[in-house]
Amino acid sequence: MTNIRKTHPLMKIVNNAFIDLPTPSNISSWWNFGSLLGICLILQILTGLFLAMHYTSDTMTAFSSVTHICRDVNYGWIIRYMHANGASMFFICLFMHVGRGLYYGSYTFLETWNIGVILLLATMATAFMGYVLPWGQMSFWGATVITNLLSAIPYIGTNLVEWVWGGFSVDKATLTRFFAFHFILPFIIAALAMVHLLFLHETGSNNPTGIPSDTDKIPFHPYYTIKDILGVMLLILVLMLLVLFTPDLLGDPDNYIPANPLNTPPHIKPEWYFLFAYAILRSIPNKLGGVLALVLSILILVLVPFLHTSKQRSMMFRPISQCMFWILVADLLTLTWIGGQPVEHPYIIIGQLASIMYFLIILVMMPVASTIENNLLKW
């Protein structure tokens, strides 16, 4: 008799995705981040659901409802901090996952890659709106600054901003709609993640060498299930270390001050995972130019497959491209640091140079490095 997991309509899908899936035998720990992102998403949806049971999306009570969760709800504090720090873990995994894709040439799976970029944008939108919900000073002013960027769009900008706000400033209507969007988007992300997997399983996984591995596949279970479980345990360990020892390490102290439209904080800055994009935004003196650079800093990922000039897929055997990649990583770390600094000398010029370098590395230096390597290999 055939096994039920291979015949049952639902279990067959699970079986083909997580059990009998033919997987390259040599994928490294860099391939763990996909499953970790799935775990992060589930964790965020669950903790978010329990927070939503006690949260009120009204300007008068939002801040105190979060305080109430932390003080009066059973284990509310741990749920709240798991949700806040879970977002940070989510973005760490996201950046690692995208970096892995760039390094090993996984972007040649076009559909998978493009849905991944959409997933990244959707996650960034969700995180931004979630940051507004506690209605602290940084929540309010972050929302004001970022939504105001829409006013840079010619002709329709001002109307668009007021339409997003639901009034003439960030107020009750804005908070309510942000809560609604923040609640619905993770489910859209979950659906998109399934499509992401669907397209990936059409081609099969890439591997560190970038060479087709059809001749050398092993079943996903038990080999990679056990490997993923190790990754999940490490993820939860790091998350719980953050939550239980330094829950506010990655947050902003200003967000413990209730939102006050009459008092602007000295330094408005987003959460750490947006600082690189914020630095690019600030480094251009023109408003529309800054907004375009901000959008392009993420959308440039869509162009990466078309800028691939190498005859090899992975960077494993391409030392010049490896150098470029790690310079890009250093550049992004520099941008992240600059995004958290005040707008004054020398930070302004460092930010501008780092922003120029970011686009230059991806658009010019990496394709040129690949071409040089091709010539060195007499290809």
UniProtKB/Swiss-Prot annotation:
Topological relation to the membrane, as annotated: Multi-pass membrane protein
Example of a GO MF term: ubiquinol-cytochrome-c reductase activity
Cofactor note: Binds 2 heme b groups non-covalently.
Subcellular location: Mitochondrion inner membrane
Binding site for heme b b562: H83, H182
First-listed, main subcellular location of the protein, grouped into a coarse class: mitochondrion
GO annotation terms (biological process): mitochondrial electron transport, ubiquinol to cytochrome c
GO CC annotations on file: mitochondrial inner membrane; respiratory chain complex III
Residue sites binding a ubiquinone per the record: H201
Assigned keywords, A-Z: Electron transport, Heme, Iron, Membrane, Metal-binding, Mitochondrion, Mitochondrion inner membrane, Respiratory chain, Transmembrane, Transmembrane helix, Transport, Ubiquinone
Transmembrane region(s): 33-53, 77-98, 113-133, 178-198, 226-246, 288-308, 320-340, 347-367
Cofactor needs: heme b
Binding-site positions, heme b b566: H97, H196
Functional description taken from the UniProt entry: Component of the ubiquinol-cytochrome c reductase complex (complex III or cytochrome b-c1 complex) that is part of the mitochondrial respiratory chain. The b-c1 complex mediates electron transfer from ubiquinol to cytochrome c. Contributes to the generation of a proton gradient across the mitochondrial membrane that is then used for ATP synthesis.
Additional free-text comment from the UniProt record: Heme 1 (or BL or b562) is low-potential and absorbs at about 562 nm, and heme 2 (or BH or b566) is high-potential and absorbs at about 566 nm.
Subunit structure: The cytochrome bc1 complex contains 11 subunits: 3 respiratory subunits (MT-CYB, CYC1 and UQCRFS1), 2 core proteins (UQCRC1 and UQCRC2) and 6 low-molecular weight proteins (UQCRH/QCR6, UQCRB/QCR7, UQCRQ/QCR8, UQCR10/QCR9, UQCR11/QCR10 and a cleavage product of UQCRFS1). This cytochrome bc1 complex then forms a dimer.
UniProt family annotation: Belongs to the cytochrome b family.
Record protein name field: Cytochrome b
Organism: Capra caucasica (West Caucasian tur)
